[in-house]
């Protein structure tokens, strides 16, 4: 076999590897889609009998402490807290933890909610880095807004201070830039009422608020963003939550509850020692550690996902900010999977150990590397094919069928799955009612796969490399425009 034959064999073998990987990852998403469809079908059948008003009026409904860690969030903090105080739930408090902001985050809250400094002793059940410097209570209504100011220690440390300060049975963690639908707590707390012994954590859907109409901290009209970057993130979020989280929850393998909206039993959080401060993705790491704790102690615990409650978040509209976000997210995933690698393929951890963890290693952690090298391969193959077609060369090193099959499996398959998420959204919730918004969403599902997806893979790959090199990383300064200002 001469050198050109060896090169041709190697190139075609690489092509078939990328095809096989693409088929496997997209077929696994197809399975998750079918599981999600089954879950939404069950949801549609039971939604009329949910009796959420009974939950609202039941005096024994567990109280919820809403924790909002804030760092330089003055652009939208007041609107976010206003939305929290307007939620329908019989017993809740809002705890804002200002993690040493450099802007006027605390001053905005103190003025807006007529707060007064009070000498509250925050327990130290969970060890924290930052020191509490002051605590404030609102003089309005039922005094259910508490502001805790502390020295900077990072998001996880701020949440741990919030857990210590929480006075309710359940703890709801939300991002400071998030808005919740009025009935969100009723929905996300329902699993705890239905199965109080086994349910230990519950997560809800997070959607992109950019472009929507915001009034008094509430999304009043859902619209697709006009800018291309946030509208692509809309379809990303729909696919991740309506297919990914719902499908994994259906089989008991939910590995991630978004830090933008998740509820946990406080007693379980204290048992776990709060959130880890030595990794970037503290919210996901907490859920993985919870699964590990359940398995190590032979407990019959559940981590569930509820598709109905909605938290709205502001997606980055600046490419540099989005790059930092995606690098941080993938670095967090890399650190988590490395830290808990002992769970992989261990029956003790059930579906999480046997299915979810291996899947995340193969199709989340490694996906950006395969995609980046796949793009390089495709570019080389197209150049060689073009040279042959123009008569510049007659090498025929790459089988043309390999190129077309790779394009079909990697692009068309992905578009179909994204469109499936849009169909699920329309049949189940119908948040986007206008034809214009639906058309924009469909276009965004196509737009995502041409340029954005490949650049995003490059960013994510960089996040893993940062984790493996041990590069120092902090919370970061994520500039926001503020919800309702798009």
Language-model regions: role of each:
Residues 98-118:
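A conserved acidic beta->alpha catalytic loop
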């Amino acid at each position: 076999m001469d050198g050109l034959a060896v090169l041709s064999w190697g190139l075609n073998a690489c092509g078939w590897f990328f095809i096989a990987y693409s088929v496997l990852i997209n077929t696994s998403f197809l399975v998750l889609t079918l599981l999600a469809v089954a879950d939404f079908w069950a949801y549609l059948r039971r939604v009329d009998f949910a009796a959420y008003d009974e939950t609202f009026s039941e005096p024994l409904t567990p109280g919820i402490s809403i924790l909002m860690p804030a760092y330089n969030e003055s652009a939208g903090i007041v609107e976010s807290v206003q939305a929290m105080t307007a939620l329908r739930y019989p017993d809740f408090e809002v705890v804002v933890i200002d993690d040493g902001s450099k802007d006027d985050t605390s001053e905005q809250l103190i003025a807006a909610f007529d707060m007064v400094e009070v000498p509250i002793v925050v327990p130290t059940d969970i060890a924290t880095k930052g020191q509490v410097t002051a605590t404030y209570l609102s003089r309005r209504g039922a005094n259910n807004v508490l502001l805790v100011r502390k020295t900077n220690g990072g998001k996880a440390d701020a949440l741990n201070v919030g857990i210590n300060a929480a006075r309710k049975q359940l703890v709801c963690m939300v991002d400071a830039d998030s808005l919740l639908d009025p009935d969100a707590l009723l929905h996300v707390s329902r699993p705890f009422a239905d199965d109080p012994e086994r349910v230990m954590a519950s997560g809800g859907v997070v959607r992109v608020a950019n472009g929507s109409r915001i009034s008094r901290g509430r999304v009043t009209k859902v619209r697709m963003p006009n800018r291309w970057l946030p509208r692509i993130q809309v379809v990303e979020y729909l696919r991740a939550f309506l297919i990914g989280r719902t499908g994994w929850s259906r089989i008991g393998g939910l590995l991630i509850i978004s830090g933008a909206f998740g509820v946990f039993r406080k007693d379980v959080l204290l048992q776990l020692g709060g959130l880890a401060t030595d990794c970037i993705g503290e919210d996901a790491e907490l859920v993985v550690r919870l699964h590990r704790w359940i398995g190590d102690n032979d407990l019959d615990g559940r981590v569930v996902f509820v598709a109905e409650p909605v938290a709205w978040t502001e997606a980055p509209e600046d490419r540099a900010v989005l790059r930092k976000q995606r690098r941080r997210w993938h670095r967090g995933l890399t650190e988590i999977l490395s830290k808990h690698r002992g769970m992989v393929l261990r029956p003790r951890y059930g579906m999480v150990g046997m299915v979810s963890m291996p899947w995340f290693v193969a199709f989340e952690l490694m996906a950006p590397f395969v995609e980046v090298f796949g793009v390089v391969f495709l570019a080389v193959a197209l150049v060689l094919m073009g040279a042959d077609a123009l008569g510049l060369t007659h090498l025929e090193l790459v089988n043309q069928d390999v190129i077309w099959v790779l394009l079909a499996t990697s692009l068309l398959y992905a578009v179909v799955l994204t469109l499936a998420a849009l169909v699920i959204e329309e049949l189940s919730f119908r948040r986007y009612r206008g034809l214009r918004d639906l058309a924009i969403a469909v276009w965004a599902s196509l737009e995502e796969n041409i340029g954005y997806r490949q650049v995003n893979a490059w960013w994510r790959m960089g996040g893993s490399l940062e984790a493996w090199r041990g590069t120092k990383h902090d919370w970061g300064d994520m500039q926001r425009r503020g919800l309702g200002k798009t």
